[in-house]
Each structure stands twice: as C-alpha cells, then as structure tokens.
Amino acid sequence: LDRLSVPDGFEISYYVDYSHAPRSMVFGDNGALFVGTRSPTTRLVYAYVDMDGDNVAETEYIIDSDLESPNGVAFLNGDLYVVTTTSVLRYDNIEDRLDNPPEPIIVYDNLPDNPQHGWRYASFGDDNRLYIAVGAPCNICEYNPDEFGLILSMTADGDDVQIEGRGVRNSVGFDFHPETQDLWFTDNGRDWVSDDLPPDELNRISDTDLNFGFPYCHGGFLVDIDFPQDNACEGTQAPVYGFP
C-alpha cells in the first residue's frame, strides 16, 4: 500500500488481505462484501463480513463454487445476482444465509458462450434493471453485432432484454451518474497496433442503442487497420476521454 498515492484527506488500508483472485465486488444492504472472480481455476464467489466494525473483514464465506467465470456481482432488494459467462444467477436473501447459501435461481441463461472477454461486469441502475457488459469474442474481428460487443440491460427477472450500447470491445467496469443516471463505462482498446493507440476509453451512455465504433473505429477517430471502412467513425460515439 505504501506505493499508492491518495488525495489529501484520504487514507487507504486493507479491508481484506487474503482474497482469491478478486475481480469485481458489491456491498449488500447489511454490509457484506460480495466478490466475483474471473480465474478459470478459482470459479468461486465469496462474501466478506466486518464483524466488529473496525473496517477490516474478519470472516470469509464461500457463496458458490465451480461456476464459469463468475465475474459480475450485483445486489438488489436483499438478493445477490452473479453473472457468469452464459448466465445470470440469483441468491435470495443472501445476507441472512451466508453460512448456508441457497441454490441459485437461474434468471437468464442466454448470454453468448465465448471465453474471450467472457467475464461479465454487471450493476443495477436506479431503474432496477440489470446492466451487463458482453465483450467482443476476439482481440479484433467482425462478429454478430446483436450478440457480442454490447452493453445489455434486462429486468431483475431476466425479461425485456435491451441493447443499450454496441461496438464495445471489452468493458471492465461501469457506474451510474448519481444525478443524470447516465451509464459511464470503460472500454479496453484493441491490441497489436502501437504502444499508445488505439486508446482505452471512458464512455457515456445517455440514450439506448448507441454505437461506440468497435471493430471499425477506435477512439472516435482511428479507422481500424485490419477492417478499414470508408466513414468508419461516422455515426459512432466518441469517448468522453481516451487513455493512452
């Protein structure tokens, strides 16, 4: 931790220092920290609880095991949602059952089965819809734009699936603006072009079915070298910020 810098007035410390390949996390209503993992060998979802209020979690629970990249975790109305490569699972009243977790309810089981960029990030919006990142199945390729490279949303019951954004290579995190509820998300740019290009992106979704360019346009300005198209960036959403 001594290698990290924080702004004045902030401090950083360990909450859990023994977690197993954590990748995404969410707090429950009663303070349990749920952690999803990406590793093909870990395949677990954990919960950590600070029992004495000292801002250090002392107790670890295994919520489920032998799952397919259970990366995405989200929480709504007392229930934990876990998003694997292909499915959305729900664990009801989970904070009351940490030491004996229930069998999950399959909410949705039609996410595309492809391991590359197959770890899903997920979060609930203020509209109580579950938002899920579905990455492209490659470093750079053409693919079915209705199946891959998407930000999806659905109801908490897995119904009314909608495409919120297209042309997204690999988002590894997103959140909602507390006032506008616009969805802000990262997108990792393609490899094997140069050290600095194309940029990784910070993007914003303020309307449905927006196109963020991949695989033909990167960063709002750069036409792809493997799949060049005339006017490739026309009609696409430029990032709010490009990371070199």
Please give the residue ranges for each predicted region:
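Beta-propeller domain segments
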Residues: 1-8, 119, 136-139, 149, ...
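A short helix->beta-strand "capping" segment at the edge of beta-propeller domains
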Residues: 1-20, 58-60, 243
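Beta-rich, blade/repeat-based domains predominating
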Residues: 18-30, 65-79, 83, 112-130, ...
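Residue position within the beta-strands of beta-propeller blades
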Residues: 34-36, 82-83, 130-134, 185-187
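Short, solvent-exposed loop/turn segments at conserved positions within beta-propeller repeat blades
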Residues: 39-44, 83-84, 99-100, 139-149, ...
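A short loop-to-beta-strand structural motif that recurs across blades of beta-propeller domains
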Residues: 43-47, 79, 87-89, 150-152, ...
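Short loop/turn segments immediately following beta-strands, especially the blade-tip
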Residues: 48-54, 91-99, 205-212
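Asp-box/WD-like beta-propeller blade repeats and closely related beta-sheet repeat scaffolds
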Residues: 58-60, 65, 69-70, 74-76, ...
